[in-house]
Amino acid sequence: MSAHAKQKRLTTASIRQMKGEARIVCLTAYTTPIARLLDPHCDLLLVGDSLGMVLYGMETTVGVTLDMMIAHGRAVMRGVEHACVIVDLPFGTYQESKEQAFRNAVRLMQETGCDGVKLEGGEEMAETIAFLVARGIPVFGHVGLMPQLVHTAGGFRSLGHSDAETQKIWRDGIAVDQAGAFAIVVEGTVEPLARELTEKLAAPTVGIGASPACDGQVLVSDDMLGLFSDFKPKFVKRYADLGTAATQAAAAYADEVRSGAFPGPEHTFQVRKPSPSGK
């Protein structure tokens, strides 16, 4: 094999095998440049429907379309050489029937080249997940807080504080695991419950606002990088403040344009003088 042979990307099977062996690192990515920056450091890159809020200024993820997810999925795939890439099925593209879910998941995978799809839902989606997995579509499950159901769930809030919530999330996790999801996002769930799910389920859990005991963690990259400032969830740790850096850079640019300092001679093309030989 050539020393320059392209390294194979991680697969959904690789991610599943990490349970109990290594913590899974997952971040969201929506564009080629960001995917290139994150790829060397991540096991999983998620093209999340959160792009509706952090890129398009929507109040929820409900308005995101399949065409939007395909466009951003393609962009991310162009920037990835290492990580496994999963793309969200957006609201309304899989809930009607397992056949609808299959058609849209096939389109998503064929048109982006991604490694699998993510969908939200527990017991009510278990049959759909099993249907997709049996037909060759890897599924990343999602239980606990489900952003696509924000209008019926009473907003964005942590879950598992009551017996009813605990039992629902527990049943959901078991159902999605038994349906064959290769991994499961556990979102906005109290620590003891997330820990118990992680210990019980065969599939690795990837927490967001859940427990450090989860098999991995995911954050929205724009939150982690300090690019999204509309609100900051309790579970977000900001590792950079790129929003402030961008604002400061724009202000410096504006000052230099208005003062005439930019562009300077080093940024300006001049007419080349012909050489004495005429060449």
Curated annotation (Swiss-Prot):
Pfam families per the UniProt record, alphabetical: Pantoate_transf
Query: Which GO molecular function entries does the Swiss-Prot or TrEMBL record give?
Result: 3-methyl-2-oxobutanoate hydroxymethyltransferase activity; magnesium ion binding
Residues noted as binding 3-methyl-2-oxobutanoate in the record, renumbered to the chain = 49-50, 88, 118
Task: Specify the superkingdom.
Answer: Bacteria
Q: Which cofactor does it need?
A: Mg(2+)
Cofactor remark: Binds 1 Mg(2+) ion per subunit.
Record-level GO BP terms: pantothenate biosynthetic process
Record field: catalytic activity: 3-methyl-2-oxobutanoate + (6R)-5,10-methylene-5,6,7,8-tetrahydrofolate + H2O = 2-dehydropantoate + (6S)-5,6,7,8-tetrahydrofolate
**Quaternary state and partners of this protein?**
Homodecamer; pentamer of dimers.
What is the stated purpose of this protein? Catalyzes the reversible reaction in which hydroxymethyl group from 5,10-methylenetetrahydrofolate is transferred onto alpha-ketoisovalerate to form ketopantoate.
Q: Family per UniProt?
A: Belongs to the PanB family.
* Protein name stated in the entry: 3-methyl-2-oxobutanoate hydroxymethyltransferase
Organism equals Agrobacterium fabrum (strain C58 / ATCC 33970)
- Which gene is transcribed and translated to give this protein? panB
